[in-house]
Amino acid sequence: MAQKIKPPQKLIAYLKQAGIKHNLLEHKTVYTAYDAAATMKRKLNEIAKSLLVLAGKDYYLALIPADHNLDFKKLAKVVAKFSGKPVKVVKIPSEKVMENLLKIKAGAMSAFGKLHKLPVLMDKNLTKVKKAVFSSGSFNHSIEMAVKDFIKLENAILGDFGIKKKAKLELKKRIKTN
């Protein structure tokens, strides 16, 4: 059983200093965006999944709705456009790299890249909701705030790099055919 982690004080101070309206949500221990949605009784598209990615030689924080998967080729194009350099490979680094580079536990990737000096890339599908729930870097706390405020705060680069998961669509098709 995971030990309860306090909300990251650095993040709380960051949000307070920025004067950003937000809600600190305390919840049972969760390790995935899917579990966070179920625990907080939220729709998957309202949960921002935070992914550390390595594009070429640089690290970025990619945010996609929890009901989407990451399209690595599309993300490479977004990064290339942003950086002005061609990007051949985009990958998710190992948990060890995450722990060593950012000094965080695997699975507790905060959505707030500025705290880690990482550029934030946000899939445009997250802008379809007014408010979203973002990872705080704790397994027991999340931050709910307006998506437009998050974009402004983090200088998030918007792009199209999420693919809607097919699981729900396939389930609906099976139900209709029965």
Question: Which residues make up each language-model segment?
Answer:
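Extended, low-hydrophobicity, polar/charged segments
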Residues: M1-N178
